[in-house]
Amino acid sequence: MSLVIKNLQRVVPIRRVPLRRKMDLVRSILGVKKFDLGIICVDNKTIQNINRIYRNKNVPTDVLSFSFHENLKAGEFPQPHSPDDYNLGDIFLGVEYILQHCRESEDYCDVLTVTATHGLCHLLGFTHSSKAEWQKMYNQEKLVLEELSRYTGARLQPLSRGLY
């Protein structure tokens, strides 16, 4: 199904074609290509507002995920009952925040891909609220990014690396 990437900010230039290409590969690796996915790029002010409203945290952040299928357990796939259910949800990328925290040696597009992959894992029920949950999420991210690296030649590391 479709992957929609919307750029709703003007602070950071976004190259949507490489991000789309990589995220299409990530969706294939995860086996969720038949589901719709939205990726929305926003600035610090917008991501902070969303973070305040939905998480009670009045600070900008790198990624927020809003799943269409609530209560999925880590690694479960949604079970659509109608054509409208073929939707994973939306990932908001705080692209200004991501750029501000991007190391000089890192490729910004690669960091966006890693961050979006992290968000996609959240849409599939993975969390990092406890060490055990984090380990599952880290392993999933690592597996996906290693496979993606085989296609792209990049050496991508999970966003959740080092959380515990």
Curated annotation (Swiss-Prot):
Binds 1 zinc ion. Keywords: Endonuclease, Hydrolase, Metal-binding, Nuclease, Zinc. InterPro entries: MetalPrtase_cat_dom_sf_prd, YbeY, YbeY_CS. One of its GO terms (cellular component) is mitochondrion. Its cofactor is Zn(2+). GO terms for molecular function: metal ion binding; metalloendopeptidase activity; RNA endonuclease activity. It comes from the Eukaryota. Its EC number is 3.1.-.-. Coiled coil: none annotated. Zn(2+) binds at H118, H122, H128. It is an enzyme of class 3 (hydrolase). Single strand-specific metallo-endoribonuclease involved in rRNA maturation. This is Endoribonuclease YbeY. It comes from Mus musculus (Mouse). The lineage of its organism: Eukaryota, Metazoa, Chordata, Craniata, Vertebrata.
